[in-house]
Amino acid sequence: TDYEVYYTDNALCIELLADSSSYSADKLKIGYDVADLSTITAEDVEMAVETVEMCRSVVGIVPDLICAPGWSTDPTVAAVMAAKAPSINGLFRAKAVVDINTKTVNDYSKVLKYKTDNGYVSEDMIVCWPMVKSGDYLFNISVIVCGLIAKVDSDNADCPYESPSNKSVSITGAVCADGTEVTLSLPQADVISVSAGVVTVLNNGGWTLWGNYLGCYPKTSDVAKMFICTNRV
């Protein structure tokens, strides 16, 4: 091997070794393997979620958010995430941040029924809809929610007492999986957030996260259980 590969910040660097013969070469041949993501199944993701138990032993960190963007739209995967979240190693609690499928739910009025019918109703779930975009890139909203929660926690000395709701998010729009724009008025966003207990985004003079309820709401009205910020403390 004449080179080594490593990441630095957001860049992938290829560095020739000191004794490499490639310094004098006119052409370089670089070989690599590419993961075939098409072979991943929902069952693979479910098995991966089970290994969250090993995080403390392997890296010395216990996750407090479990996220599987692109897969938590499968109700079975979401259920496994929620089942694992409340008791990691029998000691630690987390929240499963899950997405509602925008291929099926393409309008805000369908959110509550789909959520209820498909079991996204756990106090260990932060349920999210729709997708979001930044420029030409589409993201599952759970990615944005996890990032914002982590930032808010970090700003508060890693104490999770503050809600992520009504905090700015760096996106340029809300969309469904097919790219269709989702434009919500404040009352419509409240139908998703307050009536359905689902976290969404709202453009009200700037994009913000909108919603502070866990999946168990509105069935549960216990303040200690239904709010993201009180339940996580």
Residues covered by each model-derived region:
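Surface-exposed interaction regions enriched in Ser/Thr/Asp/Glu
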Residues: 1-43
